[in-house]
Amino acid sequence: MDLSTLAAFALFVAVMTGTPGPGNLTFMAIGATSGYRTAFPVIVASQLGSLVLNLCVAFGLGQVMAEGGPLVTVFKVLSMTYMAYLAWRIVSLSIKPKGDVRLPSFWEGILIHPLSPKTWAMSLVAFTTFFAGNGLALGENAALLTGGLLIGGTIAHSIWALVGVSILAVLGDGPLLRATTITMAGGMLAATAWAMLL
């Protein structure tokens, strides 16, 4: 892989991981309602899930998903169901008293990317555009794909969570924060539905 291709991949990662999607909106909402300390373990978990997804794409599952069929239909149902559950969890953080709601867990974070249509699309496009047929061994391509998306995802999710913390500092823990959190949860569902149509 030459330097210009690597630079193009880095730009792709920065744009794709930095734009709104289920993961980024989730972490902004967690940051806004519970702070960065609460968001960070879930960010780590989400990146472990992303790592597994990207390895699966690199080793052939991406091609199976790209061909469509019953597996993709099952994925879409699971994806929308999980994102609806996640949206409800995010809204619960802002409308229930602090002691009455369980914070998002490590295990809930692991499923964010494997069930995110945006992440699947991003991984498939990255692999086919920058790594397919480039002359490197499959293991090398898998390492570059997963490493690049892991770094980009961790940075982007952290930035979005810190934006959420800033929202909390500005709005305080009241009706405006609740309205903002509900809007973010709705945005996450809309982003998921939109990604399914692409």
Each language-model region and where it sits:
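Juxtamembrane transmembrane-helix termini in multi-pass membrane transport proteins
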Residues: 3-70, 125-145, 149
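Hydrophobic alpha-helical transmembrane segments in multi-pass integral membrane proteins
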Residues: 54-58, 115-128, 186-198
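Hydrophobic alpha-helical transmembrane segments of multi-pass membrane transport proteins
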Residues: 141-165
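Flexible cytoplasmic inter-helical loops of multi-pass small-molecule transporters
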Residues: 92-105
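Alpha-helical transmembrane segments and their lipid-water interface positions
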Residues: 23, 49-61, 83-86, 120, ...
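Selective transmembrane alpha-helices of multi-pass membrane proteins
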Residues: 66-95, 150, 156-160, 170-198
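Hydrophobic residues within the alpha-helical transmembrane core of Major Facilitator Superfamily
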Residues: 14-15, 48, 84, 110, ...
